[in-house]
Amino acid sequence: MSDQPVSQTAPPLYIVSGGAGAVGEQVARLTLSQFEGAEVPLIIIPNVRDLSQIAEVVERAAHQNGTILHTLMEPSLRRELMRLARERGVAEIDLVGSVLSRLATVLRKEPLGKPGLYQPRRSAYFERLDAIEYTVAHDDGNKPHELHQADIVLVGISRVGKTPLSMYLAVLGWKVANVPLVREVPLPAELFQVDPRRVIGLIVEAEQITARRRWRQRRMGVSIGGNYTSLDAAYDEVEWARRTFRQHGWTTINVTDKSIEESADEIITLISRRFSQLP
């Protein structure tokens, strides 16, 4: 197989915002930088303030098989976008809804729902961008020589949700690396030099792992082969992962049927108690 990048034009990614769309664009560009040779048109739709604009952008995305990434603060607009996207079969990524919901619960206050209110402190703003950039660059075991720079290292077998959980934590300001656990592939030596209190082993029960893997195969339209989608093999693999985590003294978190927000909250609580200097 050639190591040369292959140019691949993909359907567009719509950045929908009630403001300028800068945050959504930044996250999109940082993430796309990890896909060498991929050409994904970014279409920024700023200043979205009414339902007719929502309907228009969803329709455009549906016709082009596009994906919508949105940072809408107004709840009614966000709900309408998600509703229409479901109806039209359009993939959508909500960058702020989960964070708003969590903070509303913690603070016991309702968000204002107005775009453009945030004027970031320069240092905090760039620290968060650094966290996102680090996390994107250290996805799926990349750059193991820099694992020592991570606030959190997630380890787990295929389909436990390492990448989306890593990105959610990064948006909250945490530098996160994730490392795949594969029987045929030795874990990087650098992982064992990381403070084990920073390493979190993720577990998803075998039935859900199998369902996720089968869904992925159907979506990709390919058969990976072997025992990848075997339930018996998944049981064995999950138990092996548990033993591996215990062997190295890594905290194990079972994320079966948990939302990303719940899993992130559990991890943040653990890490914050262990390292009070972290965000």
Swiss-Prot record:
Keywords: Kinase, Nucleotide-binding, Serine/threonine-protein kinase, Transferase
Family: Belongs to the pyruvate, phosphate/water dikinase regulatory protein family. PDRP subfamily.
EC number(s) stated in the UniProt entry for this protein: 2.7.11.32, 2.7.4.27
Molecular-function GO term, any one: phosphotransferase activity, phosphate group as acceptor
Job description of the protein: Bifunctional serine/threonine kinase and phosphorylase involved in the regulation of the pyruvate, phosphate dikinase (PPDK) by catalyzing its phosphorylation/dephosphorylation.
Reactions performed catalytically: N(tele)-phospho-L-histidyl/L-threonyl-[pyruvate, phosphate dikinase] + ADP = N(tele)-phospho-L-histidyl/O-phospho-L-threonyl-[pyruvate, phosphate dikinase] + AMP + H(+); N(tele)-phospho-L-histidyl/O-phospho-L-threonyl-[pyruvate, phosphate dikinase] + phosphate + H(+) = N(tele)-phospho-L-histidyl/L-threonyl-[pyruvate, phosphate dikinase] + diphosphate
PANTHER family for this protein: PYRUVATE, PHOSPHATE DIKINASE REGULATORY PROTEIN 1, CHLOROPLASTIC
Pfam families in UniProt: Kinase-PPPase
Protein name per its UniProtKB record: Putative pyruvate, phosphate dikinase regulatory protein
Record bears the keyword Plastid: no
Keyword Nucleotide-binding: yes
Residues of the signal peptide: none
Positions contributing to ADP binding: 156-163
Top-level EC class: transferase
